[in-house]
């Protein structure tokens, strides 16, 4: 049995956990719908018994009974609403952790920025359950009861009601089904247009400086106009069906009164039955109208459920891993390869090992796979082949909550989070002031932080808004060093640093080496190679050279001298 089917059962199993709550909602709905017969019975008794007898006491008793039943129905509706609200919340709580983790895992692998869509789908499901849609589906099975009572009053009344529900009901339910592709396309175009605008306007400085606004706006407008066109088409169809449904209901109720009057004139039914029939046909149509009104919600909820099913099937919850002792920093890369979903090879047969406390510098041209290797070394991505081990433990199988604090990672594109500087450095855990300050001092950013208006309590915007690129990189370095990790992977750590920042970085790496931390530096600047015990050279995703730093540097110098000699042979001739 495949994982997908197992996960399908797991998602539906969440609903089965709350089957008692669904049964309770169903029972309340049954009682409410049976009590909906009370107004028709009341009118039948008033017209056929009270008016004929002129008995005011009977009218009073019937009215009091009717008032009591209405109050009881109101109480049942209130309790039913509370049940579904709590049911939706409980289902959300049962699913949100798996959905959040799966959305995070997909974003980690694909990097498509669509993690929020899964959380939106979960919200849509909760709103579907807690809204009128669920009531409609519980009420629809009871419309045959009202139809049966109409047949009991007179077969012609039942036939008219049945015919009146088939036509508008069929049209109303068929239209959303046929319009599903239009609505789905409209939503997809809207999401794409919004995502495009967010991605483009995030770089407002570049857009303004180079006059790109008009070109980018045209790209956004193309998608936006497609969204508007599809939305208008869906809205026009919905308006046509809504108008037809509304006026067919009015026409049916009028015809029911007319037919009832005709039957009453012929003496086949009483005037009370005529009025009761008019009320009952409204009850027959009401669930159908509700179902038509929420059909699009049902379609959206079904699509959201299918997306969540596929998401959690593709990224199932990780089994709880046994807690391991804190690692010392022994890093082993065993024949690691990495390929993209499209089949492109990023890395091929990378293999090396580092003892605790060693420093490795990774060199290579742009696009050689350095950053991809960095992601593998911290367990942010799983290799297609091979293993990355820290103290013998596979990084893709360990508990990240345990191993994560022992690893420091500075990506090439440093992203800080909305919150205070102290929270960012402390990785949004329980911030230990001493550890926060120690990490900041180690990264050489303590004085810079103190110069800010609120020091360590300075609030950052999304992505570290309010700081320069160099400042973000130094704060990211402090975050990587927080908690004295045993392994640090620093991807282009000096890319945005000035001379002062470079000096602080060199001092920080020396301090880490003295503490016995294993450090991996990815850089294109030769200055950092002086700190390395080993050097790895990547070329087009392959390991071109790996060895002791002095041997690799000597080989590089000899190769460079040979290349210069070939390019300028006269320089090598004796004078």
Swiss-Prot record:
Residues the entry annotates as binding ATP? 364-371
Q: Which residues form the ABC transmembrane type-1 domain?
A: 22-300
Q: Which residues cross the membrane?
A: 22-42, 56-76, 133-153, 154-174, 255-275
Question: In its UniProt record, which GO terms are filed under biological process?
Answer: protein secretion by the type I secretion system
Q: Which PROSITE patterns match?
A: ABC_TM1F, ABC_TRANSPORTER_1, ABC_TRANSPORTER_2
Record-linked SMART domains: AAA
- List each copy of the ABC transporter domain by range: 331-565
Membrane topology, record value: Multi-pass membrane protein
Pfam families for this protein: ABC_membrane (PF00664), ABC_tran (PF00005)
Citing just one GO molecular function, the answer is: ATP binding
Reply yes or no: does the keyword Chloroplast apply.
no
Subcellular location as annotated: Cell inner membrane
| Entry's Gene Ontology cellular component terms | plasma membrane; type I protein secretion system complex
Q: Where is the signal peptide?
A: none
InterPro entries, from UniProt?
A: AAA+_ATPase, ABC1_TM_dom, ABC1_TM_sf, ABC_transporter-like_ATP-bd, ABC_transporter-like_CS, ATPase_T1SS_PrtD-like, P-loop_NTPase, Type_1_exporter
The family database entries (Gene3D superfamilies) matched by this protein are listed as: ABC transporter type 1, transmembrane domain, P-loop containing nucleotide triphosphate hydrolases
Can you tell me which family this protein belongs to?
Belongs to the ABC transporter superfamily.
NCBIfam families assigned to the protein according to its UniProt record, in alphabetical order: type_I_sec_PrtD
The protein depicted here goes by the name: Proteases secretion ATP-binding protein PrtD
* Species lineage: Bacteria, Pseudomonadati, Pseudomonadota, Gammaproteobacteria, Enterobacterales
